[in-house]
Amino acid sequence: MNIRDKAWDVIKWKMMKAHLGYTDEEMKVFRENPRNEDVLSKAPALLKKTIVLEVVESHGCNSQHKVGDKFFFDGAGNLLTKQCPAKVCVYALNAATPLIYASNELFYAGIDPNEMRFKRSACIDAGVQCGGWGRVVLELGVMERKEA
């Protein structure tokens, strides 16, 4: 390990401790889990990504989401509100959660999240035919942040 890598190794743990607000004991537990080291080693590359969920179907949406609307998230899964529609339906976000989780798991495993086979999810509203109001279907894509 070169000097730069050694320095980063020290800094990253201090940064994570401060970022997560961990006590020394919590940080000890965190560091003892080898999965956390693996995830942190891949975090810089993931943070260069933008997760995009595009509305590919919409009918009767109370929040007025339309086909082509996009919801943007950073690589860690945080909603980038300034890039999203003015109103974002919580039920659409609920549909986004498992897709973002799966895309991050694939990324950490070294697999391109865009290769996900089932990359669509729908809001919880069943649509008017089933006693609801509307329905929105989202499709996930992951791109370089500079392209988003």
Residue ranges of model-derived segments:
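Glycine- and charge-enriched low-complexity intrinsically disordered segments
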Residues: 2-34, 94-148
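Acidic, aromatic-enriched beta-alpha/helix-loop junctions
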Residues: 69-111
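Beta-strand secondary-structure signal
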Residues: 50-54, 137-139
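Short, basic/aromatic beta-hairpin or loop at an interaction surface
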Residues: 40-52
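Short alpha-helix capping/helix-loop boundary micro-motifs
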Residues: 55-60
